[in-house]
């Protein structure tokens, strides 16, 4: 499980909580967020500022209607540099602060050193202001001692970072869900058709969603 799975389950969380949101998928190689939640997410090209500007436009569209909307962006790894330039050149964090919009950076951590280095780079790039959510992704490792003992995590915690755990979903169930481009709601509720989840598979997905939602409930979303 990677960052796109996290974006998908976050989207499902917002749907189940009846919280309006718009989603954007910057990963041109897979576009799985837009594929699994096509009614809520659309691809966005990060090679141009015009493409990235669409993301912030969603906040402006939602102002004044008394129904604030969140935006979920699935960021591909290769988008870090153009994203940072766009944020800096647009003074985006200050602008969103003036609009009353909280910025949440999610760092999906695996058990390796590269993940720690990426967190360090994220903190050094944006510093104080945004919320930082560090997610220990058990789908990509189980020994997070490098992260726990790192200076990067200490710096993140000093800025108020929250640390949660994303449990691993049973692999066979995840493969079936991916094969059919199914939302997590569809995975739990569909009972007919080829290769649908069996009763106990659906139960395991329900438990995984419940555990994940409990972790999300601890965050200022």
Model-flagged regions — what are they?
Residues 51-54, 82, 91-92, 151, ...:
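Exposed alpha-helical structural elements
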Residues 5-6:
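Hydrophobic positions on the alpha1 helix immediately C-terminal to the Walker A/P-loop
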Residues 1-2:
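Conserved glycine(s) of the Walker
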């Amino acid at each position: 499980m990677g960052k796109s799975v996290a974006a998908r389950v976050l989207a499902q969380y917002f749907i189940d909580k009846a919280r309006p949101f718009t989603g954007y998928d910057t990963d041109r190689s897979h576009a799985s967020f837009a594929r699994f939640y096509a009614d809520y997410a659309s691809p966005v090209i990060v090679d141009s500022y015009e493409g990235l500007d669409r993301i912030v436009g969603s906040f402006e569209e939602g102002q004044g209607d008394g129904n604030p909307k969140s935006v979920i962006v699935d960021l591909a790894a290769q988008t870090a540099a153009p994203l940072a330039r766009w944020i800096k050149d647009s003074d985006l964090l200050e602008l969103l602060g003036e609009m009353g919009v909280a910025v949440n950076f999610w760092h999906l951590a695996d058990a390796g050193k590269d993940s720690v280095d990426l967190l360090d780079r994220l903190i050094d790039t944006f510093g104080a202001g945004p919320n930082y959510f560090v997610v220990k992704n058990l789908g990509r490792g189980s020994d997070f001692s490098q992260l726990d003992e790192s200076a990067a995590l200490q710096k993140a915690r000093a800025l108020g970072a929250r640390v949660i755990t994303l449990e691993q979903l049973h692999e066979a169930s995840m493969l079936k869900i991916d094969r059919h481009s199914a939302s997590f709601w569809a995975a739990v509720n569909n009972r007919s058709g080829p290769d649908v989840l069996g009763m106990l598979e659906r139960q395991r997905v329900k438990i995984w969603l419940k555990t994940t939602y409990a972790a999300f409930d601890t965050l200022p979303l």
